[in-house]
Amino acid sequence: MITRIRGEMLEITPDYCVVMAGGLGYKIYIPDNCQEEIPDPGQEIDLHTYLSVREDAMTLYGFTSGEQLAVFELIMNVSGIGPKIALALVGTIPPTEFYLSVLNDQVNQLTKVPGIGKKSAQRIILELKEKVKDITSKDAYQDISASEKLDNTGEKLGISTRHKHLDELKAALSSLGYTNREIEKTVDAIQGQITEGQDMEELLRLALQKLNTK
């Protein structure tokens, strides 16, 4: 599997680019929103890639960030969705907006993508909601130390519930590819909106909405 290509940019078109790496020229299809990040011919480029293998063809798809690739691979797991539609979605909706659309059942947001109708959008939400929740929270919960968990009587050990949830939120945002600076600024900005009893999903929605308004 080819997961990363770094080399010299040879050619750029509205649909794909050609990268020379290791003496070979790779034709790589890219989403629309990557066009501005693609360097001019002759300059070096580093792309995260996905290799689609079919009986009649092998096709490379490239992305300027690991987060875009993660969303592309996630969408490819949806029944009836192929690489062309997955690429169109990544090129139309930024990863943060996509996660919000799935978590908040925003069918109309997904139907903005060429090739995705109402039924396809509903299927994407139905099949991916739990996976998106898992992606945005799994790493956070794995990182919680034993001293941050509750004992058998429900007493908190060594850290407040609020502090614990903020740590979990930071870890979840980090797993989505955001920088420490972006995470700290976002968490500081939403602290005034946090109320007692909010779960991780609600906190994550607040944070993603804040990041999406930048």
UniProtKB/Swiss-Prot annotation:
It holds the Pfam family HHH_5. It is found in: Cytoplasm. SUPFAM superfamilies: DNA helicase RuvA subunit, C-terminal domain (SSF46929), Nucleic acid-binding proteins (SSF50249), RuvA domain 2-like (SSF47781). Residues 144-160 are annotated as: Flexible linker. Keywords: Cytoplasm, DNA damage, DNA recombination, DNA repair, DNA-binding. CDD domains: UBA_RuvA_C. GO terms for biological process: DNA recombination; DNA repair. Residues 65-143 are annotated as: Domain II. One of its GO terms (molecular function) is four-way junction DNA binding. Its main location: cytoplasm. Residues 161-214 are annotated as: Domain III. Residues 1-64 are annotated as: Domain I. GO terms for cellular component: cytoplasm; Holliday junction helicase complex; Holliday junction resolvase complex. InterPro entries: DNA_helicase_Holl-junc_RuvA_I, Hlx-hairpin-Hlx_DNA-bd_motif, NA-bd_OB-fold, RuvA, RuvA_2-like, RuvA_C, RuvA_C_sf. Has three domains with a flexible linker between the domains II and III and assumes an 'L' shape. Domain III is highly mobile and contacts RuvB. The RuvA-RuvB-RuvC complex processes Holliday junction (HJ) DNA during genetic recombination and DNA repair, while the RuvA-RuvB complex plays an important role in the rescue of blocked DNA replication forks via replication fork reversal (RFR). RuvA specifically binds to HJ cruciform DNA, conferring on it an open structure. The RuvB hexamer acts as an ATP-dependent pump, pulling dsDNA into and through the RuvAB complex. HJ branch migration allows RuvC to scan DNA until it finds its consensus sequence, where it cleaves and resolves the cruciform DNA. Homotetramer. Forms an RuvA(8)-RuvB(12)-Holliday junction (HJ) complex. HJ DNA is sandwiched between 2 RuvA tetramers; dsDNA enters through RuvA and exits via RuvB. An RuvB hexamer assembles on each DNA strand where it exits the tetramer. Each RuvB hexamer is contacted by two RuvA subunits (via domain III) on 2 adjacent RuvB subunits; this complex drives branch migration. In the full resolvosome a probable DNA-RuvA(4)-RuvB(12)-RuvC(2) complex forms which resolves the HJ. Belongs to the RuvA family. This is Holliday junction branch migration complex subunit RuvA. It comes from Natranaerobius thermophilus (strain ATCC BAA-1301 / DSM 18059 / JW/NM-WN-LF).
